[in-house]
Structures are given as C-alpha cells and as structure tokens.
Amino acid sequence: MSQAPLVLVDGSSYLYRAFHALPPLTTSTGKPTGAVKGVLNMLLSLRKQYPDSPFAVVFDAKGPTFRDELFAEYKANRPSMPDDLRVQVEPLHASVRALGLPLLCVEGVEADDVIGTLARSSAAADRPVVISTGDKDMAQLVDGHITLVNTMTGSRLDVDGVKEKFGVGPELIIDFLALMGDKVDNIPGVPGVGEKTALGLLTGVGGGLEVLYASLDKVPELPIRGAKGLPAKLEENREQAFLSYQLATIKTDVELDVEIDKLYPGEPQREALIALYRELEFKNWLDDLLREAKEAGENGEAETPIQAEVDYDVVLDQAGFDAWLKKLEEAELIAFDTETTSIDAQQAQVVGVSFAVKEGEAAYVPLAHSYMGVPEQLDRDAVLRALKPLLEDPKKLKVGQHAKYDINVLANASTPIALRGVAYDTMLESYVLDSTATRHDMDSLALKYLGHSTIRFEDIAGKGAKQLTFDQIAIEQAGPYAAEDADVTLRLHQALWQKLEAIPSLARVLTDIEMPLVPVLARIERNGALVDANLLGIQSRELGEKMVALERQAYDLAGQEFNLGSPKQLGAILYDKLGLPVLSKTATGQPSTAEAVLAELAEQDFELPKVIMQYRSMSKLKSTYTDRLPEQINPRTGRIHTSYHQAVAATGRLSSSDPNLQNIPIRTAEGRRIRQAFVAPQGYKLLAADYSQIELRIMAHLAKDDGLLDAFRHDLDVHRATAAEVFGVPLEDVSGDQRRSAKAINFGLIYGMSAFGLAKQIGVERKEAQAYIDRYFARYPGVLAYMERTRAQAAEQGFVETLFGRRLYLPEIHSKNGAMRKAAERTAINAPMQGTAADIMKRAMVAVDNWLQESGLDARVILQVHDELVLEVREDLVEQVCEGIRPLMSGAATLDVPLVVEAGVGSNWDEAH
C-alpha cells in the first residue's frame, strides 16, 4: 500500500493571495479577517483531501535571508505588507496551531527553502509530496514524486504539467527565471529578455545557463526576434544572469530540526479555537465547535449559562397548563414564541406555543402535532381562548424574537388573538444597538451575546426536500427546541436591553420608533394588496413578445444565434467576435458582462449591449412580477401580502420581500404598467401619499445652509433654484437640461458622487463637472461645511446619527484601504439623511395607523414603498382621509423647512401618482 503524501503548504503565498483576491471581511469592530478566513478555508479543504497525510504549513520568518546578503536589492521593489494584512498574521498563526497543524518558520531562509528541503528529503525516501502553492518558482521542485497544487484555482502540476505551462521542464525552471528575472522579487535577470525570448534561448540551445553561455555563437541563428543582438546582451549581463540563478534557486539543504514522521497533525485545541473564532467573529465555525463541545459534554470555554441545568416543561395536561397560566399571570415580563406549519405568517397554522418567565424556566405547550403515535395534546382552541385575555392585555409586557410574525400568526389563528403589550423584540434590540454588527436571527444573537449554540431547526426537522414541518416533529424533540427559543429570547433581552439602556438615545429609537411600528407593519401585511391577475397575464404575454423581438434583434447584431442569458456566450460574442473593448474582468479573469459594463458600452453607442440591457430588464420584470405576482396571491384572502423587514437595511429603511416592492421601476413604461395591476376593490380608491424631496429637505435642515433653507421655505423648485445658482442665470431662464444637471448634483452629492460620476451622468467632461460642484459649494457653503463636519465626526466617533438618535457604525472609516475609507465617508454623509427619512416615515406610519384605528374609518394602509404610503379608502371618504393623514405625515418631524406631502388618488397604484 502506497504511503500518504507529505502535504506542504506555502502559507505566506496563500496569505497574500487571499488578502488580495477575497472580499475584505472585518469584525464588528473593524478588525480585518478576510485573509485569515480564506487561508483557513483552504487548509480545512486540504485536510479533507489528505486526511492521513503528514502536514506542514510554512511561513516566511521575519528578518533578512541569505538572498539579501547575495543581492542587497532583493525584493526591494516589493511594497511593505499592508497594515490590514499585517494584523492578520498572528491570528492566522494562532488558528493554524489551534487546528493542530504543524507550523514552521525558519529564520535566514524563505518558506520556499523549507518546503524545498522537506520535499526533496521526503522524495528521497520514496514518499510522494504535494506542495500547495500559487508560486511559479516552486515548479523547479517538481519531479516524479513531487506535485504542485493550487488550491485557489484547483490546478495541479506534475512534470508534464510544468512543461505544458512554462514550455520547459522542471529542470530548466531556474534557468528560465534567471534569464527573464522577476519584478516582484526584484531578481534582475538579463535586461530585454522576456518570457518568449528566455524560452526560445533554452529550447534553442537544448540546455540551461551553462549550455547557453557555452553556445553564444549559435544564438544569432535561433528563430528569436532580435537574435543577432542577444549574444552581446547576454555576455554583458553574464554575472547578473548567474546571480539571478542563485537568487531563483530554492535551497533543498536547509538544516531543519524536523522529522517528517513528526508532522502528523494533532488534535484541534477546541477551547483555543473557540476563543479565536469568537474574537474573529467566524460565526458558523464557532457554532459548529460549540455544538461539538456540547455533544461531547465538554465545558471550559464552550460552557454557557444555558448549558447549566434548565427546567423546560412540555405541557400535555390541563393541570400543567393551569400551573403555567398562573406563572404567566404573575410574571412581570413574558418571553413567548409560536411554533407553526409555515414561515409564511398569512398561511401558517399554530402547532404550539412556548413561554419563559425567568432564566432557565420555560415551557412548550404542543397543540397540533400530527404523526403516528403522537401523545394526546390539549385542545388548541381551548388553550388559545385561555391565553387570549393575557396575550391581549397591553399592560402585560411581553418580549419576542421577530414578534411581528407571531402577531400575524395569532391574528389569523382559528381562535384569533390580537396580541398586545409586546414591549421588546430581541431582533430589533440587536438591530438598533448596531445594525451591521451581526445578523439579527436568534441563533446568531445567542452565539454573539450569550456564547450559546442553540438547537437548530435542521437538527430536529432535517434538511431539503425531506424536511419535516413542525407538526410532524416528535414532541420529545420539539419540546426542548421550542422551550429553548423562549428561554433564549428572555436571556437575550436581558443582555441587549442593558446595552441599550447605557445609550439612552438608542433605547428611545427602540421604544419610540421601532416597537410601536411592529403592530402597524403586522396590520399592513395582513391587509394585503389587491392585484389584477388577468392584467398581469396580459402584461406577461406582451413582455414575452417584446423579449422574442429583442432576441431576434440581438441575433442580427451578433450575426448568429446565442443564449442571451449566458454570460459566457454573451462574452464570446461581445469581445471575441465583435471586438468590443474589455472594460472590466470577473474574479476568474473573464471579460465582464455585468450590467454596469453593458451600460458603459451602451453609452459608447454599441448597439448589442443596449439590446441586451433591454432584454434583461424585461426578463426580470416578467420573472419577478408579471409571472410571479399571480402565484403569490393568497388563496384565503385573494390578495398579495408582502413581508416588511425592519432589521435588514443598515440605515433604518424598511425593505420588503415576496414581492419586493422597492424594485418595481418607477420611470419605465413597463414598471408603471406593473403598478397598474395593483388595484382598488369596487367602491374604493387607492390614495398614495408621498414625501416630496424628503432627503434634500433633511440635508437643508442638517446643513443649515441659508440658500437651501430659503428655497424650501419659499416653496421654490429646488432643482431649478440650484440650477440658477450653479449656472448663474435668472430663475425664469433655467433650461430643462440645466435643471436636470442641477437635480443630478443635488441628489449626487447626497450619495457622495464624485466629479467623474457626475460627468458620466450628465454627459460632460470631468473638469466641467468639477466646476459645477465647485460652484455648488460656493453658492451653498453650508452643505460643504456639513459634509466636512460629518466626515470628521464619523472619524472621531466611529458612527453617525440620525436626528432621532439612530446610529450607523462605520468600522471602515479608519481603514488603511483608501477605497474602503472613502466609501465609509460617503456613507457617513448620506446615512444621517437616509436614516432620518426612514425614522420620519416610521413615525408617520404609526401616527396614521393610530388615527385610522381610533377614527374607525373604512380605510387601511396596504403598501409602504420608499417615501410613500398607499392606502385603500372607501370612495366617499377619500377627501376626509387625505385631509387627515397629510398633517400627520408632515408633522412626523419638526425641521427648519416644511415637510411637504403630495397625495394622489386613482383606481390603481399608477393612477394614484
């Protein structure tokens, strides 16, 4: 039986490659971790491939090597290690050691030399060797025993592979490198000899440097460009060529106090890994480790308060339920959760309910489990009737995790319950505390704030097509899972609320904005929107016909048929066949066919990219809306019930899904037609109330700029007013083009647009765009002062705030990476405006909902999109409702300029604009 190969990993090479090739991940405090994660992923993959192999991860040691003594300029061109990479070296070394993998660093030589020595030693003992590297220098080591693998690309090089890739065998790789040199390592080589010339010389004379220099008289006859002048050039640089040979040669005789048989990996140090993964915020790996520790019955770092003894009840009889009902009535705060048949709250059926009243004391009441041999359960409606007074009592405080879902489930239950008194929601507590620090699901929060790995749904229900619904799960498994949900929710609230109370402005955002909004959003979701499925069917057919016509047009332009949805085929047509300029490449080095690239090509008047963009736009509308919306109609209500998400957008904005209303195009005819399919029922109208230029008004308020304040206070067309200032013309003489340019400047500056971006948008030279921006700031100095002030505050504090105290943390504001830092600065300027607009809309939604509930009017909010509320109103009440909601929306905040609300009415959503 053959021996398992020795696996040698070029750690230094992969560290650099991972840093430059992978996304720049950071922790919630801004600590870079992307390179660490990339290298660890690669190591774990290699260990799976070679489970029985001795293994060593080799890194360059600090300090000079023998090559620096040979040539003082060695690696002089290489820039110093970036700070964001330097800080990842120690955590990576610590993680490698904690994984039980042998790690080698030898002073005076490079990692290549250590790898070369171990590889040759192992090969001499007839053991195969696998070197994992992306470094071309290593090709010189390849022989019958030694193979190279590049884990990042999946490529493998044996002797034949080296010949195919480089044109010479492993025995000539050093000579090849010596002739052509290496700019990265500053190996000089022979000036004027590149890859093709070096290859021609070595193959032409049939040997390496020694043979070449003994055969200079044959060089002029070789079929190489400039061959006649090469002998003189080679002779002149003879010493440099042989120096380069020495520099490029990997040592294979380094004195190492290492025995190959001692390089077998040891057991991972679980506690050390848990501590490291916590620090690096590697959530999934940490979760797996904690779960393993729990299953193994280990404590130490893996121990959490929840792993201590808990008292979880599964309530199957009336006496047990009565006892828990008494506990709930006596508790100051109840954590609750529902278990159901579906993640769709509008279709889910209650399977059970769980509660916790103090840490470790929780219960699950199964109500509708259904499988062979299921124990007898309490009657669902009887239990819900008994819980109804408690759950509907607004004075009985409750905490949930994503409570909006439970509110809707209980409202739709066979015994409907109007859940009130939900004072806290751990998802929203985490979101308000720091919207970007972590995901806000319970599993992630438990891991982050409690150090606890929860029972996952997949653990009890399975995965994929065979996954059980909750009613099919055995009560013995369902009980601990459901009771833990309630217990963890209570513990999370205690941890998170303490942090929020320490920052009163954030506590107010939770209690005054986010929590009052929860029942409002739940009601909007239940209300749903009526859509005309027949009209959507007609639109779908029409879009399909237009797509067929665009396909034909694309085939004509390409001169052949191809799959318009295939980036590979499209790339071949655009770049190989039509010869369009390559503006950008993908991560794999292929010419990009991304939307932004096609848009740029279309701007250069290339026809095919224009057609492809039109085709893609229509394809997306068809698949996402005209085909999909009819499928999303709830069979019980006949309406579409979108889901609103409070804890997704970093700035505080709401987002939506199933369907995503935010992405319906506003300006295209096709997008407007989709809005026409959102209709009012007979006897009703749709009322759309929209904030006018809310972010610009907030900018005027924040910047305190007299010019902008004056324009809004006098109800001027702010874009026309800006155009008059920037272009130096009277207000009445502003042209349409000037107004459009001014609008681009107004909105562009909010989003941190550069002169380059503005020039592209309005079709002028960059210098001209910069002149417009300069004139803008000269006319509106308050805006420039606000931007500079905000950048400085963000850098000092690490966060920015809305008018209502919501924070957006910006860990990249101190990044050494200039692009990331600039992006954080742009976010710092925009986030207070976008976040304040979000806060105002949320406050308005609560005010409007309260008024509608108190008034008893036959009107309801059915949609919230961007800065707009859409209501369904009985026809004879339209004027009354319009007059009622306008002051509520405009009064949602007090600014230095008026908050203007524009309203429209129609039989469908498009008509209401």
Curated annotation (Swiss-Prot):
Keyword Membrane (UniProt): no
Top EC category: transferase
A Pfam family of this chain: 5_3_exonuc
Keywords annotated in UniProt: DNA damage, DNA repair, DNA replication, DNA-binding, DNA-directed DNA polymerase, Exonuclease, Hydrolase, Nuclease, Nucleotidyltransferase, Transferase
E.C. numbers: 2.7.7.7
Family matches, as SUPFAM superfamilies: 5' to 3' exonuclease, C-terminal subdomain, DNA/RNA polymerases, PIN domain-like, Ribonuclease H-like
Reactions catalysed, as given in the entry: DNA(n) + a 2'-deoxyribonucleoside 5'-triphosphate = DNA(n+1) + diphosphate
GO BP, one annotated term: DNA-templated DNA replication
SMART domains listed in its UniProt record: 35EXOc, 53EXOc, HhH2, POLAc
PROSITE patterns hit by this protein: DNA_POLYMERASE_A (PS00447)
Domain 3'-5' exonuclease per the UniProt entry, residue ranges: 306-501
Renumbered residue ranges of the record's region Polymerase: 505-913
Matching CDD domains: DNA_pol_A_pol_I_C (cd08637), DNA_polA_I_Ecoli_like_exo (cd06139), H3TH_53EXO (cd09898), PIN_53EXO (cd09859)
A GO molecular-function descriptor: 3'-5' exonuclease activity
Function: In addition to polymerase activity, this DNA polymerase exhibits 3'-5' and 5'-3' exonuclease activity.
Oligomer status and interactors: Single-chain monomer with multiple functions.
Family: Belongs to the DNA polymerase type-A family.
Name recorded for this polypeptide: DNA polymerase I
Species per Swiss-Prot/TrEMBL record: Pseudomonas aeruginosa (strain ATCC 15692 / DSM 22644 / CIP 104116 / JCM 14847 / LMG 12228 / 1C / PRS 101 / PAO1)
Gene: polA
